[in-house]
């Protein structure tokens, strides 16, 4: 579907700036939707722009709808799809957020620090302060384990194979912390800025560390983890804050 972006843009009388905006929006759209358009994927895209400003959301919806109509006209699509402002991702009463497609988080990017921060939250359910406190000595990539030491205690967390290359890249030259400058950990604002820049670059502007952590919770629950097991993984004193995800 990406191959039709340029012919579509060429078919419209657009200024150079407008062409760049259309191209940027459509590349993100195609990245999330993929090659086969269906209602579920469109809802996924709708969810990804839900936290944008009203003007940005309207622009992206308009661009995507024009592109969808173009694809229908040239018979790439057998059915005509249209995104609307009122479309919402289906949610259950017990789950107040939808699981998003995170494939794009693992793709090559110039914003490698923000990417690794987001992946550590998505993969391990860490808080920003826990990410900031990761020490080089407590990362064992051979055995794929992270020993996390906090005021609440010590947790040993498994590292997925997909996470290892991202960690290897950032460990080079580090003295004490995974995220540091000459042995001094970066500030809380530094983490916030780098995470914000990365998620914005992949079309998830407004996706906070808290929302990323919620994605971890939803996926672990879906994988069959009990509320007690998940509470232990997250290092919580009690599972009370997780109850809303487990209510029937």
Swiss-Prot record:
Gene Ontology biological process terms, A to Z:
DNA transposition
Gene3D superfamilies linked to this entry:
1.10.150.130, Intergrase catalytic core
> What does the UniProt keyword field contain?
Cytoplasm, DNA integration, DNA recombination, DNA-binding
Q: Does the keyword Protein biosynthesis apply?
A: no
Q: Pfam families from the entry? A: Phage_integrase (PF00589)
Q: Where in the cell is it found?
A: Cytoplasm
Task: Report whether Iron shows up as a keyword of the record.
Answer: no
In this protein, the active site sits at 149, 213, 245 (o-(3'-phospho-dna)-tyrosine intermediate)
Gene Ontology MF annotations: DNA binding; tyrosine-based site-specific recombinase activity
- A cellular component term, taken from the record's GO annotations: cytoplasm
Tyr recombinase domain: residues covered: 85-248
PROSITE patterns noted in UniProt: CB, TYR_RECOMBINASE
Q: What is its main location?
A: cytoplasm
Q: Which residues form the Core-binding (CB) domain?
A: 1-72
HAMAP family in alphabetical order: Recomb_XerD_like (MF_01817)
Q: What does this protein do?
A: Putative tyrosine recombinase. Not involved in the cutting and rejoining of the recombining DNA molecules on dif(SL) site.
Similarity comment: family membership: Belongs to the 'phage' integrase family. XerD-like subfamily.
Question: Which NCBIfam families does the entry mention?
Answer: PRK02436.1
Report the protein name in the record. Answer: Tyrosine recombinase XerD-like
Upper lineage: Bacteria, Bacillati, Bacillota, Bacilli, Lactobacillales
């Amino acid at each position: 579907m990406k191959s039709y972006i340029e012919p579509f843009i060429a078919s419209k009388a657009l200024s150079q700036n407008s062409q760049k905006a259309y191209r940027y929006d459509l590349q993100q759209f195609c990245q999330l939707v993929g090659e086969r358009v269906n209602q579920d994927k469109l809802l996924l895209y709708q969810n990804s722009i839900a936290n944008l400003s009203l003007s940005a959301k309207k622009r992206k919806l308009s661009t995507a709808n024009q592109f969808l109509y173009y694809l229908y006209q040239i018979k790439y699509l057998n059915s005509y799809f249209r995104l609307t402002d009122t479309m919402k991702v289906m949610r259950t009463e017990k789950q107040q957020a939808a699981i998003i497609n995170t494939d794009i988080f693992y793709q090559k990017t110039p914003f490698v620090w923000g990417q690794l921060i987001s992946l550590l939250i998505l993969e391990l359910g860490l808080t920003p302060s826990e990410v900031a406190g990761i020490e080089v000595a407590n990362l064992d990539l051979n055995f794929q384990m992270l020993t996390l030491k906090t005021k609440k205690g010590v947790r040993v967390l498994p590292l997925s194979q997909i996470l290892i290359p991202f960690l290897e890249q950032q460990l080079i030259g580090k003295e004490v912390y995974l995220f540091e400058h000459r042995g001094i950990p970066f500030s809380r604002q530094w983490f916030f800025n780098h995470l914000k820049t990365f998620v914005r670059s992949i079309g998830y502007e407004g996706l906070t560390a808290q929302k990323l952590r919620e994605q971890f919770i939803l996926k672990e629950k879906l994988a069959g983890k009990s509320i007690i097991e998940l509470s232990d993984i997250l290092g919580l004193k009690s599972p009370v804050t997780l109850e809303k995800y487990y209510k029937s």
